[in-house]
A protein has these predicted regions:
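Basic, helix-initiating cap at the start of DNA-binding domains
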Residues: 1-29, 33-45, 58-62
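C-terminal peripheral helix-coil segments that are non-catalytic and often amphipathic
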Residues: 1-2, 99, 134-146, 164-171, ...
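Base-recognition residues in the alpha-helical recognition helix of bacterial helix-turn-helix
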Residues: 27, 51-55, 63, 67
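Key DNA-contact positions within bacterial/archaeal DNA-binding proteins
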Residues: 48
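Hydrophobic alpha-helical connector segments
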Residues: 63, 77-106, 150, 155-162, ...
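Amphipathic alpha-helical packing segments from all-alpha helical-bundle domains
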Residues: 70-73, 77, 103, 120-146, ...
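Helix-loop "lid/cap" segments that line or gate small-molecule binding pockets
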Residues: 76-78, 95-102, 110-117, 192-195
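Amphipathic alpha-helical segments used for helix-helix packing
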Residues: 100-122, 138, 171-175
Length: 200
């Protein structure tokens, strides 16, 4: 293995240990009760090493959610399923990127506060945002390839519209809490409105 490959593997291993240690501590005691010193101790590294990877404890929370969303994002490639309407496909994509976080509601609240407070997105979040855009663009291309669809707007505008609606849905979901009935209804309605703009 080359020195660069070994160095990268060690970097990824250290990052994974930090995220894993933080996740375990957050689950046991809550995000606010855990310190960076405790995360470093649980990961068997120095506190400074944690800061080499993450600017703040909240950025570890963002990393955890990005990993959850990577899995949900992969499932969007399966959409639309056979017999699924455009509105159903968009709603399914929207809800997959929300429902995967039911067990992580406190994390989502931290994520939203970090997202809105930051002057610019963390590099990891910016990179993941590009992946989300690509997955959604591919979904819109598949939907627009169906008979009876119109291309009144460019795909990047459709992706931006979806993402704008979706961030509002995530905020509503995080504020509402279980059983998320209002958020679920709003997802269906917002995505139905977006779908109407695509159909002839």
């Amino acid at each position: 293995m080359t020195a660069v490959g070994l160095r990268e593997r060690k970097r990824l291993d250290t990052r994974h240990r930090i995220v894993g240690a933080a996740s375990g501590l957050f689950e046991k005691r809550g995000i606010d009760a855990v310190t960076v010193d405790e995360i470093a101790g649980a990961a068997d590294i120095g506190k400074g090493t944690v800061y080499n990877y993450f600017e703040a404890k909240e950025d570890i929370v963002v990393a955890l959610l990005v990993e959850l969303d990577r899995t949900a994002l992969a499932s969007i490639a399966e959409l639309p399923s056979q017999g699924m309407s455009v509105a159903e496909a968009l709603d399914s994509a929207s809800w997959r990127l929300i429902d995967n976080k039911v067990e992580y509601l406190p994390y989502v609240r931290v994520y939203l506060s970090r997202l809105f407070a930051a002057a610019e997105a963390a590099p990891e979040l910016a990179e993941f945002s590009d992946q989300v855009d690509a997955a959604l663009a591919a979904l819109f291309e598949r939907l627009l390839a169906r008979p009876g669809m119109k291309r009144a707007l460019p795909v990047d505008t459709l992706v931006l519209s979806f993402r704008t609606m979706h961030i509002g849905l995530v905020a509503q979901w995080a504020l509402e809490g279980p059983p998320y009935a209002t958020s679920r209804m709003l997802s269906r309605r917002h995505m139905a409105l977006l779908a109407k703009g695509l159909e002839l």
